[in-house]
Amino acid sequence: MKLPLLNEIDIGSMRAKMADAPAFPHFCIDNFLEEAFANEVHDAFPSYAEAEKTGRVFSTVNEKRKVQITDSSKFPPAILKLHELLASEEFVNAMSEMTGIPNLMADPALAGGGIHETNSGGHLDVHIDFNYNPNTGLHRRLNILVYFNKDWPEEYGGYLDLWDKEVKECQGRFAPVFNRAAGFATSEVSWHGVTPITCPPDKMRRSFAVYYYTKEAPAGWNGKTHSTVFKARPTEYWKGVVAMPAENLMRATQKSIDSAKQSVKKLLKK
């Protein structure tokens, strides 16, 4: 496959590698974009301070020091061009062929995707993603992450790590280096996370995330929908038994409060 702004991808070879991948089907493509375009996108990323003004800031036990911008009207021109490329019919059809997932669809709203920037000290705990978007009625099937981090040595962390279904053993890890695309089929066993980021304060981990959906449910789906589900790594015992349950309780309590407020508002309108 060869599309404008994108380096050639051997679809057949990548499909075979995905089928043989440990843990769950995944892939890694270096030199994903044409170099000039990759540099253009790299230079277009906002600073962390700028991103905070327009995006959603995460500061929780599970996800910390991360900003996410999903509104494409706020994308700089080069990043908007990347969004359009990854949502194009030609690219989406090629991803269906490569992954073996028929009838993939892009998400124009980029729910949970778009520009991701994580500051030094940030992290993302191991999780499986929400499996269904109630706003569109579509099933989430594929994640693709494109990284834009130059001069990123191993000690900076921020690796994408992939885990077995019990979250006992890491089955693969990818450095978030410049112009690398990593992707995987999302499922009930596609446990993944981002290792702690330890880069200098003047740097940040930058990526662009896109997620793809189908109208049809995946084979073997049990009919249950869920939001993001987190698990502690084997080395994070206290987080798993104390911090995560405490935060889950706080979220559940807040959800109940919000629901009660909505009920009161409806009653007052009658």
Q: Where are each of the predicted segments found?
A:
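Non-heme Fe(II)/2-oxoglutarate
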Residues: 5-6, 15-98
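Active-site rim elements
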Residues: 27, 72, 77-85, 129, ...
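Non-heme Fe(II) oxygenase catalytic core, chiefly the N-lobe of the double-stranded beta-helix
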Residues: 43-46, 74, 83-140, 149
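A structural signal for the main folded, soluble domain(s) of proteins
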Residues: 57-72, 97-105, 111, 116, ...
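A structural signal for well-ordered alpha-helical scaffolds and beta->alpha junctions
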Residues: 7, 34, 38, 75, ...
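Catalytic core of Fe(II)/2-oxoglutarate
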Residues: 121, 132-140, 150-270
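Eukaryotic charged/polar low-complexity linker/IDR segments
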Residues: 143-145
